Amino acid sequence: MITSEEIKRRLWSGANDLRGSMDASRYKDYMLGLMFYKFLSDKTLETFQATAGLPKEADLVQEYSQAYEKLGENLTGMIQEVLGYYVLPEHLYQSWVKDIRNGDFELQKVMDSLNTFERNIAVKGDADDFKGLFSTSIIDLTDSALGSDLNKRSKNIKDLIFLFADLNMVDLQDGDVLGDAYEYLIGQFASSAGKKAGEFYTPRQVSEVMAQIVVKSSKIKSIYDPTVGSGSLLLTVGKHLTKNDQRDLHYYGQEYITETYNLTRMNLLLHGVRPEKMDIKNGNTLAQDWPEDPERPDEGVQFDAVVMNPPYSDQKWNKREDKPLKVSDPRFADFGVLPPDSKGDFAYLMHGLYHLGQKGTMAIVLPHGVLFRGGAEGEIRKRLLEKNYVDAIIGLPSNMFTNTGIPVCVMILKKNRELSAPVLLIDSSEHFVKIGKQNVLREKDIAQIVDTFVNKTETKGYSHLATREEIIANEYNLNIPRYVETLDNEIVQDVDAHLLGGIPTKNIADLKVLNSSVKDVLDESLTPVREGYVKLNKSVADLTDEVLEDERVKNKSIKVATKIKDYLHDYWQELTTVDSETELENLRQAMLSDMKQILATFDNIDVYSGYQIIAEIWKNTLTHDLELIAGLGFYNAGRTREANMVTKGTGQKKHEEQTGWIGAIVPNDLIAQNLYAEQVQSIANLKNKLTETEGSLSELVESAKTEDSDENVILYDLIKKNKDDEPQDSFDNKKIKAELKNVDKGSTDYDLLKKVSSLMNQKTKLNTEIKNEEKALEGAVYERIEKLTDAEIDSLVYQKWFGGLKAAIVNLVKEPLKNELQTLDTLNERYATTLSDLEEETKKVESEFESLLSELVVR
């Protein structure tokens, strides 16, 4: 069984190997297009199998071909009634694979297959859902970028076809494995394409923020993205709905770029969205307002949710059509002004707002300039605020997008806000981790944004609820720093403390965690030196020991540990009995939510750090393992081993080879450490001896390099040299053996040479023993995987998933205490040396200098 992560790695590795020098933004159309055609072929065969009542082991390609010869259009018509499309037997993806294996492959057949598919669906009502997906303007198999001649192009396409050949796209569609792999590839292509990716990709973390906020704000049956790109925003919103609500959800979107428009349709279909539940249009969103209600032409169709990531500061927003838009356009009329020609940000916002239902929620990504720029944009912003549409503004980190490094914000808009409701401003610009070239929101950053929005909480330095009066006082300027003060963690220097010594008591009062947790311990460690200043009467190291060993801290740690133990006990049964991949996301969300609730009951613990720990466990182990458990069962998965494939060679010789076996969910190293502890210790002992031996040899080499030493005279010529005759870091064993024959036994030379020879022999012997014992241990582990008992699997998997969890969460109790103790140490060092100390030191140096001068004799 293959997991989603393994599919992603395999496909992206294949893409990198196959695309050569072709631009990533172009190659994606070929790869994703053929991946989608494989899906269409597999769905055709699955529908035929179900309709014909054939068993799973049937040769579906052969059965389908024979049935088509008998029934012809009656068969394909029946399949089309179910799917909205069909692929003819001779044009199945599987027929390409068969031709390749038989040596009969022709590139023309692929082109014919793609063209025939489009012709066959053109006469049906679902034609718009598939029209143009495989047009030659998108997938041009004659493009020289695929190869300089027909043979090279044919080889490259054959390799690409084989990349998907053994994947059952129908099986992978269950649990969204296929859709997730497709989205992953889009993201990877976007990362590789850099600035060229801007038109089709919104980073997953930004989509998550927008989707979670929208879902928690409205009851959603229809969703619209006017600049839909790859469709990831629409799908992310859908993912956060219940299964029943997902089935009822209708997806709408519009996209200007044809290639990107195709990505959307394929993406939705691969995620299991039925054609009748999606309406995607290829066109200019602003110039061609869509969708329209024929019965209410001046109102436009309204949706429960609107999400979008439009082009930033689009300078051509009103120049792409013959007739420029006017302020009388119903989308803009309420505002009485058009955005400036050079910046189309508000044009997209007003378009989306026009299509937002009265009880709906809109989330849009915008550059920060819309928050404070004047002129027409200032007037539009004022109207938005006067109409009470702006619900929240979320400032995100810079450099999150592949196509721009500028910081952006997410604006949330609603039409049904209470008149007195404030505007929430969140500054999350410093909450991220850097991965490669991009800044990325962590799971905890997303959770904190969403929780702050839902609960409308104010946090110093992070969020603020701005009243109407505040906003008017700021002349409708919504620049986030005007409302959310950036926290400066640098402690202000105290002049008196520098002059006279002592730590300011106001700085001690700022140690909130120490004061609220162990105030008496802190107070006892301080001695007053004068009013407003104290000094430490013990080292910070001793104070740290006292604080961490205090009964209150230890009891709190025990309570937290007990809560975590109960938490894991409650979820263990669910995790080990999961039987459907569709359950995983709900289970993940439940574990994350419960961890937040548990930690929120304790003071001075960073709830979101605990949240991130659970998120990382899911990312690193649980998602992979639970996919296998859902398909195989817990104990069967525990006793399953897989070939350990490693990549060897480079260039055309690059290939994969099996080197042993690995446990599907139970790691080999855990089996070794827990069930073969004696063997592991024996190998460790041998490695320690090897390290000692190598150390002794290294010392002799260094001595031999030292001129005028006995070792230099005897051993220097026996050190290995490079081509420039420079000594290296080891002896030449052949020269050592030869030299031993030339010296007298019992001589100093002989004893030293014998010592080197013995050490080298010992090193060789130890290496051999280590290799043999490691090989024996590996073999034992390979055999043991399939023989693990249920109890062993319970213990080993628990250790793998949660072995370090309790300690990591308990550390959240100690971490804020340690941070403040570090601050105290910094303050102590800062004010340890006073002005009088410096003056005294200066006098001492001057006195020593004068003494030296007096000793000088002038001759």
Language-model-detected regions and their locations in the chain:
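Hydrophobic alpha-helical scaffolding
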Residues: L150, D171, T227, H250-I257, ...
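Conserved Class I SAM-dependent methyltransferase catalytic core
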Residues: D17, D23-F39, L338-L413
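Conserved NTP-handling cores and scaffolds of large molecular machines
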Residues: M22, K38, T44, L185, ...
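Non-catalytic, mostly N-terminal accessory regions of nucleic-acid modification and defense proteins
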Residues: M1-V209, V214, K219, N282-T285, ...
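Conserved S-adenosyl-L-methionine
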Residues: K196-M308, S313-W317, E321-P324, D329-G336, ...
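Flexible, glycine-/basic-rich loop-and-beta segments that form/coincide
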Residues: T402-I480, V484-L500
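Conserved nucleotide-binding/hydrolysis micro-motifs of P-loop NTPases
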Residues: Y37, T258-E259, L286-A287, P311-D314, ...
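Hydrophobic alpha-helix feature that most strongly marks membrane-spanning transmembrane helices
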Residues: T242, L269, V273, P311, ...
